[in-house]
Amino acid sequence: MFEKKKRLGLIVYLYYNRDARKLNKYGNVVYHSRRMRYSVLYIAQDETDKIIEEIGALKFVKKVLPSYIDTIDQNFVGSLMR
């Protein structure tokens, strides 16, 4: 049967927009902002350290940040009643 793999989101800030498509070989690019010059991509969680180092060493990458969506409390019950 199919097993769901754990994934991690990465925010990659770029120097130039034309280099955004080069990130496709590292993971699934789900969003690219041309105005802010960043891309959001998902990678397998078991390979995160290696891939973050590889992407960070590329000449067209300004910085790489991991997504913190897993650490944010997503229980919104009662937050609208304040």
Curated annotation (Swiss-Prot):
**TM ranges:** none
Q: Which NCBIfam families match?
A: PRK02302.1
Q: Which UniProt keywords apply?
A: Cytoplasm
User: What Pfam families does the annotation carry?
Assistant: DUF2129 (PF09902)
Q: Which GO terms describe its cellular component?
A: cytoplasm
Q: What is this protein called?
A: UPF0298 protein SMU_1670c
Where is the protein situated, by its record's location annotation? Cytoplasm
- According to its UniProt entry, this protein's organism is Streptococcus mutans serotype c (strain ATCC 700610 / UA159)
Q: Which family does it belong to?
A: Belongs to the UPF0298 family.
